[in-house]
Amino acid sequence: MYHVIAATTNPAKINAITLAFDDVYGPGQYRIEGVNVDSGVPLQPIGSTETRIGARQRVKNARQVRPEADFWVGIEAGIEDNMTFAWMVVEHLQARGESRSASLMLPDIILQGIRQGRELGDEMAVLSGISNVKQQGGAIGIFTQGKLTRTSVYHQALLLALVPFHNEIYQRPSPSKPAI
């Protein structure tokens, strides 16, 4: 049984990890443990690079907390231009898989608050009246009226991040480069 460390205690993220590992490895083939670790980036990362660094740093910190585990998974949501998205980072042994989620265009009323230094989740809570939005369906759930959720979008991206660990083509050695 695989020991999977989720570099988060957020239920929406842990649910996405659970769904992805169910799909790839099967229910009952792993156990997930959530740990609270720092991302090393601001609470609201801006830009793809900063967001990806946050996901990678979560994995690095989770590996330090639980080095005996088999997998470590970091998810970091961010804002780039007028879009929200997230980076998924999965490590197993010495290999890494990464994927970026789908993006959602945000309305100006939300972006104004973010430009003033507030987090997307806090802005959504104020405008929607739903407390703790980011641990539920997230902005995605609110704007799509539940057709998509933070969990469902992260699930898809996690499936892509897990590909290097189960697709045999990724295990093949690279062909030698021809001599020039």
Curated annotation (Swiss-Prot):
GO terms for molecular function: ITPase activity; metal ion binding; nucleotide binding; ribonucleoside triphosphate phosphatase activity. The keyword Zinc does not apply. Keywords: Hydrolase, Magnesium, Manganese, Metal-binding, Nucleotide metabolism, Nucleotide-binding. Pfam families: NTPase_I-T. Its cofactor is Mg(2+); Mn(2+). The keyword Nucleotide-binding applies. It catalyses: XTP + H2O = XDP + phosphate + H(+); ITP + H2O = IDP + phosphate + H(+). One of its GO terms (biological process) is nucleotide metabolic process. Transmembrane segments: none annotated. It comes from the Bacteria. Binds 1 divalent metal cation per subunit; can use either Mg(2+) or Mn(2+). Mg(2+) binds at residues 38, 68. Substrate binds at residues 8-13, 68-69. Its EC number is 3.6.1.73. InterPro entries: ITPase-like_fam, Non_canon_purine_NTPase, NTPase/PRRC1, YjjX_NTPase. Signal peptide: none annotated. Belongs to the YjjX NTPase family. PANTHER family: NON-CANONICAL PURINE NTP PHOSPHATASE_PRRC1 DOMAIN-CONTAINING PROTEIN (PTHR34699:SF2), PTHR34699. Phosphatase that hydrolyzes non-canonical purine nucleotides such as XTP and ITP to their respective diphosphate derivatives. Probably excludes non-canonical purines from DNA/RNA precursor pool, thus preventing their incorporation into DNA/RNA and avoiding chromosomal lesions. Homodimer. This is Inosine/xanthosine triphosphatase. It comes from Yersinia pestis.
